[in-house]
Amino acid sequence: MTRVKNSVVARARHKKILKQAAGYYGARSRTYRVAYQSVIKSGQYSYRDRRQKKRLFRRLWINRINAASRKYGMSYNHLINGLQKCNVCINRKMLADIAIFDRETFSALIDKAKINCEHT
């Protein structure tokens, strides 16, 4: 039986991993075994952090809205509750941008939420 040589395939596989590990420090960019572990782990971190990024940005928007609404004497949860009762459909990303860049509109939204909170 003839011997099957797979050196071409193995070299291609190793080159692919080492190319992905380019820029890593020390043996992580030069040695296949260590580079493979680093590439796998970096993929896990990337997968996890793509999901965490969404949570972190939502937290940032909520913090910004809370800080801006407290300048007008209203807490974040009262603002959101008042806007929902007024049927104002605006997401937290847009609300945070309005709070930073368009203070007149934000103060109008605060007034609208305050009026609605007083009725209930």
Curated annotation (Swiss-Prot):
InterPro entries documented for this protein: Ribosomal_bL20, RIBOSOMAL_L20_CS, Ribosomal_protein_bL20_C
GO biological processes: ribosomal large subunit assembly; translation
Gene Ontology MF, one: structural constituent of ribosome
A Pfam family of this chain: Ribosomal_L20
Alphabetical keyword list: Ribonucleoprotein, Ribosomal protein, RNA-binding, rRNA-binding
SUPFAM superfamilies membership: Ribosomal protein L20
CC annotations in GO: ribonucleoprotein complex; ribosome
Function summary: Binds directly to 23S ribosomal RNA and is necessary for the in vitro assembly process of the 50S ribosomal subunit. It is not involved in the protein synthesizing functions of that subunit.
PANTHER family, sorted: 39S RIBOSOMAL PROTEIN L20
UniProt similarity note: Belongs to the bacterial ribosomal protein bL20 family.
Listed name of the protein: Large ribosomal subunit protein bL20
Annotated organism of origin: Blochmanniella pennsylvanica (strain BPEN)
